[in-house]
Amino acid sequence: MSVNYAAGLSPYADKGKCGLPEIFDPPEELERKVWELARLVRQSSNVVFHTGAGISTASGIPDFRGPHGVWTMEERGLAPKFDTTFENARPTQTHMALVQLERVGLLHFVVSQNVDGLHVRSGFPRDKLAELHGNMFVEECAKCKTQYVRDTVVGTMGLKTTGRLCTVAKARGLRACRGELRDTILDWEDALPDRDLALADEASRNADLSITLGTSLQIRPSGNLPLATKRRGGKLVIVNLQPTKHDRHADLRIHGYVDDVMTQLMKHLGLEIPAWDGPRVLEKALPPLPRPPTPKLEPTDKSLAQLNGSVPADSKPEPCTWHNGSQPASPKREQPDSPAPRRPPKRVKAEVTPS
């Protein structure tokens, strides 16, 4: 459970702003915003989702900074409520919607701060997923870097040895590697994994649309990755009930439960959310499925700025997709400076004041 995960971390005083009030868009406004989100997804060629703890609360796993989050309750001297274990938690509608979006080629990559393993257990392909803070179900060989996805949580945290050894054969006829296996869960001062950080950075730079789901974007460097999309000329959509650190940079802000938003999005895209039929691990993405016919999206009479509430509703409308009325060039594909940062940044504290 996230409670046990949080308790297993080293003491750390500055966990960011916790317990901020939640904001809910009125139903009609939410519908219009999700229509616009569907339009952006259809218009984009490289969509990246950034996910946080808010996408797993519907499975019974509490978040950290929400009104009843683990750290919010801790600040109040109260015990957080939890309804399940990591092993018993089921992927949410949001997890399964992401699986289907990837299958039909509308989603290029997912960058996740979550350690609950639900992306992998939902069947989302691991080669299109960066788990920046680790996975409670994964252990890695310290010698050959082979990863093992287990059916139960590994049992240790902080990149510690688990007591098991690597069974990968070095070569035909030779004995197994027998390197020590370690968990993949980061503590506060641990450096982010080279491979996952490099993939997340490259995906964020090359995206023409980044969508954040259920994250306050307070933890660095994970929370700053969506800004790489903006710097390259792409769009940023933030879906969260609480204010986030990067709200002022968003082209569209949606305040609603992520499951409700994703359910409406899939409807507007003409896609079904697949049922979850038990844990399954998919190492590599399959060839994309054909997309269904695109349903006609109802036009919205509001610009992105009006939907965000930054322009009066009776002002002259601007083009929905581009602030200056002209379409910018597609973001230039950019490779990271190196395959993996030589000294990856540490998982550092949250910045104190969200914007």
UniProtKB/Swiss-Prot annotation:
Notes on activation and inhibition: Compared to the defatty-acylase activity, the protein deacetylase activity is weak in vitro, and requires activation. The histone deacetylase activity is strongly activated upon binding to nucleosomes and chromatin in vivo. Two molecules of SIRT6 associate with the acidic patch of one nucleosome, while the C-terminal disordered region of SIRT6 associates with nucleosomal DNA, leading to efficient histone deacetylation. The protein-lysine deacetylase activity is also activated by long-chain free fatty-acids.
Keyword Ubl conjugation attached: yes
Subcellular location(s) of the protein: Nucleus; Chromosome; Chromosome, Telomere; Endoplasmic reticulum
Residues with Phosphoserine modification: S10, S303, S330
Keyword flag DNA repair: yes
Record's compositionally biased regions (Pro residues): 287-296
Enzyme Commission no: 2.3.1.-, 2.3.1.286, 2.4.2.-
Record cross-link Glycyl lysine isopeptide (Lys-Gly) (interchain with G-Cter in ubiquitin), residues: K170
Active site (catalytic residues): H133
Single GO term (MF): histone H3K9 deacetylase activity, NAD-dependent
Region Disordered, annotated ranges: 284-355
Residue spans crossing the bilayer: none
Modification after translation (UniProt): Acetylated at Lys-33. Deacetylation at Lys-33 by SIRT1 promotes homomultimerization and binding to double-strand breaks (DSBs) sites. Phosphorylation at Ser-10 by MAPK8/JNK1 in response to oxidative stress stimulates the mono-ADP-ribosyltransferase activity on PARP1, leading to PARP1 recruitment to double-strand breaks (DSBs).
Keywords, comma-separated and alphabetical: Acetylation, Acyltransferase, Chromatin regulator, Chromosome, Developmental protein, DNA damage, DNA repair, DNA-binding, Endoplasmic reticulum, Glycosyltransferase, Hydrolase, Isopeptide bond, Metal-binding, NAD, Nucleotidyltransferase, Nucleus, Phosphoprotein, RNA-binding, Telomere, Transferase, Tumor suppressor, Ubl conjugation, Zinc
Modified residues (N-acetylserine): S2
PROSITE patterns xrefs: SIRTUIN (PS50305)
One biological process term in Gene Ontology: regulation of lipid catabolic process
Main location: nucleus
Catalytic activity: N(6)-acetyl-L-lysyl-[protein] + NAD(+) + H2O = 2''-O-acetyl-ADP-D-ribose + nicotinamide + L-lysyl-[protein]; N(6)-tetradecanoyl-L-lysyl-[protein] + NAD(+) + H2O = 2''-O-tetradecanoyl-ADP-D-ribose + nicotinamide + L-lysyl-[protein]; N(6)-hexadecanoyl-L-lysyl-[protein] + NAD(+) + H2O = 2''-O-hexadecanoyl-ADP-D-ribose + nicotinamide + L-lysyl-[protein]; L-lysyl-[protein] + NAD(+) = N(6)-(ADP-D-ribosyl)-L-lysyl-[protein] + nicotinamide + H(+)
Pfam families registered for this protein in UniProt: SIR2
Family: Belongs to the sirtuin family. Class IV subfamily.
Domain notes: The C-terminal disordered region mediates non-specific DNA-binding.
Annotated PANTHER family: NAD-DEPENDENT PROTEIN DEACYLASE SIRTUIN-5, MITOCHONDRIAL-RELATED, NAD-DEPENDENT PROTEIN DEACYLASE SIRTUIN-6
Name by which UniProt lists this protein: NAD-dependent protein deacylase sirtuin-6
Gene from which the chain derives: SIRT6
